[in-house]
Amino acid sequence: MAKINDHYLKLKAGYLFPEIGRRVREFAAANPSAKVIRLGIGDVTRPLAPAVIKAFHEAVDDLATTENFAGYGPEQGYDWLINAIIEKSYKPLGVDLKTEEMFISDGSKCDCANILDIFALDNVVAIGDPVYPVYNDTNVMIGRTGEADDKGYYKGIVYMPCTEENGFIPSLPTEKVDIIYLCFPNNPTGTVATKAELKKWVDYAIANDAVIFFDAAYEAFITDPAIPHSIYEIEGAKKCAIEFRSFSKTAGFTGVRCGLVVVPEEVMGTTPTGEKYSFNKLWLRRTTTKFNGASYPVQKAAAAVYSDEGWQQNKEIIDYYMENARIIREGLAAAGLTVYGGVNAPYIWLKTPGGMSSWDFFDKLLNECNVVGTPGSGFGPSGEGFFRLSAFGHRENVIEAVERIKKNLK
């Protein structure tokens, strides 16, 4: 009989968001007349920008003609999309990238998992706590860890607590690690990192021959000009960092699927015999073997994001969500809750009232306010006692949800 990958059996219960979905479905079945407002999972609600829709239609029309038909494209992505991203999103930051250093994908969630293919299992990994669950769970799945302890920490992973005391910015590891996951603006805490803070991590990585996985999925929500959008704004980062970006929140592509990875040619690893080798070459080899490229219509739509018209239209959509974030943040603060995030990020990280557990507060909001959020403990042990709300809802629902919560907490 075929054997399973038993590392999957180490995973704790279900993935966070399916568990939330299960509880909400049970509540809805028992309370069919209740109007449930979902501010939990970070799915967007605004339609795609008109320029993006126009490009989508044109790309579909291309596929209907012999002259413009597009079959298999380059696995790494079309140059016209890669160059548009570099020109519009990186060069204004003072970051110069080669076309060969960027890879277009079908989403950054997959990229954050698949990048592990090109790293040896005996690398020591450091992740924040709380953290986007994909970072943790994918390392468990591939066999890098032992079993989880009573707190939920897996043997073989270095956890870096992100707490109120350290401003939700992890401290440098005291032990040597090989791979460091950083996410800024942060999911789930909504925290951002300054250039000075990121410089510490870059310096650590260079000094310890480590590689930083920098998740910049929410960089488009940064409004403070002093906050870096890319790890490559930091001197030396191209020697030690791989950056992930997503179109899901930047352009509303949660149902379209498109992302990108930047793997600079300078980021090096070592072979078992100690020879240096470029991770860029390995990722290209992995990509050409396991991926046929994002679809032609999707890449055409993504390119429209970087047109002048598409850029402005998407900015207006992002501004809409950030106004939602302001409404949530200020409304809950006025209700006496301690809140973080929601300024340069679309997530609000709040402290549960009265020392309530994260899941108890989830049940309280669902049952008493008919509002769905995300329990902080689902992101890791250090998230216990906290709760995440998303700014991606419809404006009227956001306003109503805040009013319900304020009324309930009086």
Swiss-Prot record:
Q: Which residues carry this modification: N6-(pyridoxal phosphate)lysine?
A: 249
Under which main EC class is this enzyme filed? transferase
Q: Which GO terms describe its molecular function?
A: L,L-diaminopimelate aminotransferase activity; pyridoxal phosphate binding
Cofactor(s) annotated in UniProt = pyridoxal 5'-phosphate
Q: Which residues form a coiled coil?
A: none
Pathway given in the UniProt record = Amino-acid biosynthesis; L-lysine biosynthesis via DAP pathway; LL-2,6-diaminopimelate from (S)-tetrahydrodipicolinate (aminotransferase route): step 1/1
Report keywords, A-Z. Aminotransferase, Pyridoxal phosphate, Transferase
**Would I find Transcription regulation among this entry's keywords?**
no
Q: Which residues bind pyridoxal 5'-phosphate?
A: 72, 108-109, 132, 187, 218, 246-248, 257, 292
GO biological process: one example: lysine biosynthetic process via diaminopimelate
For binding substrate, which residues are annotated in this chain's numbering? 15, 42, 109, 132, 187, 292, 388
- Give the Enzyme Commission number: 2.6.1.83
Answer whether the UniProt record assigns the keyword Cytoplasm to this protein: no
Q: Where are the transmembrane segments?
A: none
Q: Which family does it belong to?
A: Belongs to the class-I pyridoxal-phosphate-dependent aminotransferase family. LL-diaminopimelate aminotransferase subfamily.
Which PANTHER family does the annotation name? AMINOTRANSFERASE
Subunit structure and binding partners: Homodimer.
The protein's role, per its UniProt record: Involved in the synthesis of meso-diaminopimelate (m-DAP or DL-DAP), required for both lysine and peptidoglycan biosynthesis. Catalyzes the direct conversion of tetrahydrodipicolinate to LL-diaminopimelate.
Q: What is this protein called?
A: LL-diaminopimelate aminotransferase
Q: Please name the taxonomic classification of the source.
A: Bacteria, Pseudomonadati, Thermodesulfobacteriota, Desulfuromonadia, Geobacterales
